[in-house]
Amino acid sequence: MFSMIRGPRAAFGTLIGQWRRGMMTTGNRRLCIKPQEGPSASPQTQRPGFKLPGYRPSDWDKKMLMWSGRFKTVEQIPEFVSFEMIDAARNRVRVKACYIMMGLTIFACLVMIVSGKKAVSRKESLIAINMEKKAKWREDAQREKEENALDAKAQ
């Protein structure tokens, strides 16, 4: 019913709805109120500022750092590395994996093209192969039917 209302009535209804929800008055918005400062924490309870930012890489992360070419051996990798270094190594390995998959896909397509051309030169096709297979199935079914008929006569 409300979707059928158009024109100035809908605009007026929206205006009234906003006013009732308190959106029209700027005094009640409370968007720019600064938080009240409470008692400040003592310096002993704050965390020390000398902690090294970083990440302790797992064995898998170390392998990715090596595969990406960042380090040559596992012994060269420091105990803590930055998140950016791990992320860059993951991205580089991801891109290498994509390139490898693209290359394998192109190689597989070329192999299929070559095998298809060889099959055409041998006069092979999927239709002929399927027809031969179905003919063999029919022969097997006919043979089983005859064997069942002979067994029934023998009894």
Curated annotation (Swiss-Prot):
Localization per Swiss-Prot or TrEMBL = Membrane
Residues crossing the lipid bilayer are 95-114
Q: Which GO terms describe its biological process?
A: cellular response to hypoxia; neuron apoptotic process; positive regulation of release of cytochrome c from mitochondria
Chief location bin: membrane
Key words of the record:
Membrane, Transmembrane, Transmembrane helix
Q: Name one GO cellular component term.
A: membrane
The question of whether Lipoprotein is a record keyword is answered with: no
Membrane-topology annotation of the record? Single-pass membrane protein
User: Do the record's keywords include Membrane?
Assistant: yes
So what family is this one in?
Belongs to the UPF0389 family.
> Mind telling me what this protein is named?
Protein FAM162B
Q: Give the organism, scientific name.
A: Danio rerio
Query: Which gene codes for it?
Result: fam162b
